[in-house]
Amino acid sequence: MSDFITIKKRTHYCGQLDSSDSGKEVILMGWVHRRRDHGGVIFVDFRDREGLVQIVFNPEYSPVAHQEAHKIRSEYVLAVRGAVRNRPEGMVNPDMKTGAIEVMVEELEILNESQTPPFSLESESDISENIRLKYRYLDLRRPQIQRNIMLRNRVAAETRQFFQSNGFIEIETPFLTKSTPEGARDYLVPSRINKGTFYALPQSPQIFKQLLMVSGFDRYFQIVKCFRDEDLRADRQPEFTQIDVEMSFITEDDIIEIMEGLMTHLFSRCLNRTFSTPFPRLSYAEAIGRYGKDNPDIRFGLELRDLTDILADSGLTVFREAAAGGGMIKAIRIPEGKRLSRKDLDDLQNFVSIYGARGLAWARVLADGWTSPIFKFLTADEVRQINGRMEAVEGDVLVFVADTPTVVNDSLGNLRIHLAKKLNLIDPEQFAFVWITEFPLMEFSDTEKRYVSTHHPFTSPVPDDVKYLPGEPGKVRARAYDLVLNGSEVGGGSIRIHRKEIQSLIFEALGLENEEVRSKFGFLLDALEFGTPPHGGIAFGLDRLVMMMTGAESIRDVIAFPKTQKATCLMTDAPSRVSIEQLMELSLKIV
């Protein structure tokens, strides 16, 4: 084993070799993925970041290299020099990118040994995630994880290329900034110099990118880290990366057009997938009405239909009372519902109860009526109208929920997804984009007993709705837009407020006192008085976008060094306690 590499500089990566390299002498460097002995000849699957290639140690070709190869084990680090050749007839491996060739090794140098890893790097499953994260530097050697990280790099590079070719300027914004909570908790950083004060790590560059528009930079982008101290899920991290964009002198349509260009560029260059534009658009009200969610998966049908007007005077008490109490009745049509047994229908009832629904009615559509526990409570005309609105045909199953609008949409919106998975209605290879627009600008918080911003307080209201701000802020629609991909929000943004008087109206509607507004946002209000142009922007979650492009199950599989769902790093043992001396320097005390 050598402290220095004596074999000359690497000439190729393993995974980049093919039949066109046959006859060439190559120098490769990487790791032993798998070792096999066959009749005195040693075969090694040799790995680097670009993939695998089979290298061969034959005593007749190079006795010295063959003798040295007896020492090597899995994950040893090697440098080899040898000749590429086409594999013998019948020995081609079609499951391997480089399966048509192999490298006959003439010279071997063992650069380092390795202990036996705590898990198999060949396995794609059945490994405890905690073990993987504790030994993340080993987990990152696994081919699938490396492919994910390589695609992430490609997405970032293509993003920069796209924006720079469209006249955008990449500008960095501060990480140490002022705490202006935007919905989640801030990560706070104590100042040693200014004792008793704190910076906050940014939840987004929102204010700074708006100030860049005030500064005249016109088209800004940045691939930037953001931080939110919130409870984690499979697709959330305390620190995450977003593609951040802001533009001046534009409308919603301008931003949407550019962002559709970005998405089609990324999917074409990184996955060789093409899409037609423009993408479909739904208002928030349409999305909730048809899908029960503001992030609908439009790869399949099973849309919700409102039957409240038909069933408001129904003989079924639960329907009648829901309508009379300001609630609603909605249904989903399940084509070829004969696939659902009575037990399946009972299970669906249990499923919707998770979302607050008190029951789920069902009906099997026959040629001459229904088979249903509720059939006897309905008139023939009601059944006829329901069949017409649901476009029901013989063999379909209809499922109904009657409750408050929130419960109905939540339960049926989630049931729709559940059914699609159960009935295999989703094409996992399909990507379906949809824009959701005109969100409510504000929503009432039962916890805070006031209206709060649905997105953030700098979102511009729809001009026709400004009149509702003083007395009925819940009616105001936002000039906001989300891009949804396969049922997941991958980006969101809005047209911003560029006039101080409108921004002041928003703060008033949010119940914020002048003193609090000046303390948190005084510099922004001041900037709005110095010729702020109309502007707007958007941010895409890079982690989530790459997760969907790779088909990964968790966002942690597309981040090099992610945190756990408890926001810890098992590899470095962060967060950790610090010394009393460090705390004293910061004038802090643990209580």
UniProtKB/Swiss-Prot annotation:
Domain of life: Bacteria
Reaction(s) the record says it catalyses: tRNA(Asx) + L-aspartate + ATP = L-aspartyl-tRNA(Asx) + AMP + diphosphate
UniProt entry keywords in alphabetical sequence: Aminoacyl-tRNA synthetase, ATP-binding, Cytoplasm, Ligase, Nucleotide-binding, Protein biosynthesis
GO biological process per UniProt: aspartyl-tRNA aminoacylation
Site entry: Important for tRNA non-discrimination: 38, 90
Nucleus in keyword set: no
Protein's UniProt name: Aspartate--tRNA(Asp/Asn) ligase 2
Name of the gene this protein is made from: aspS2
